Amino acid sequence: MVEDRLISGIEACVASFSREVSTGKESEIFLVDLAVKAAGRSVKIEVLVDSEQGIVISQCAALSRRIRDMIESDDELQEVYGEVFELMVSSPGLGGPIRHVRQYIRHTGRLLSVRYRDDAGSVHDVTGRLIEVDLAEGHEPFLVLEPVRSGRKKNGSLPPSRLKMMLDRIDKAVVQVEF
């Protein structure tokens, strides 16, 4: 399928670009999300990339040029997508859900709203400061949140002072914008 070819080509562009510009694991650029959508007569290709240190606009622009060149130099992709496609390469930005486990590292110290399942399978919502992230091999990856009271309620109980959550039990995590 041509869309699979496009996706694997974009993944390869991100990987090769990352190898060229990265100075270590923290600056390694990774693909967060990729969406291909029909937009009238054209196609919109949205590529979200990030690194543990964050990504700058000049890197997004350079990666966008590389992806566009890849599409335009591939006869099969050119035939399907033609010259009428919109390509957007950017970082995920604040306020959206975390989609890649390595994004947690970048957001250490920030406030997160998390929906997670406990050992019994019950769903809980908590807002807290991301204190620690452990993605090391040899054990299940986890994070540690320090819950904060949200809203104006004075009563009500907070969860324990720190919550350790396995990443596979997190249904959704969103970085909260603080002022």
Curated annotation (Swiss-Prot):
Pfam families: RimP_N. The keyword Ribonucleoprotein does not apply. Keywords: Cytoplasm, Ribosome biogenesis. SUPFAM superfamilies: YhbC-like, N-terminal domain. GO terms for biological process: ribosomal small subunit assembly; translation. One of its GO terms (cellular component) is cytosol. Transmembrane segments: none annotated. The keyword Transcription does not apply. It is found in: Cytoplasm. Belongs to the RimP family. PANTHER family: RIBOSOME MATURATION FACTOR RIMP. Required for maturation of 30S ribosomal subunits. This is Ribosome maturation factor RimP. It comes from Prosthecochloris aestuarii (strain DSM 271 / SK 413). The gene is rimP.
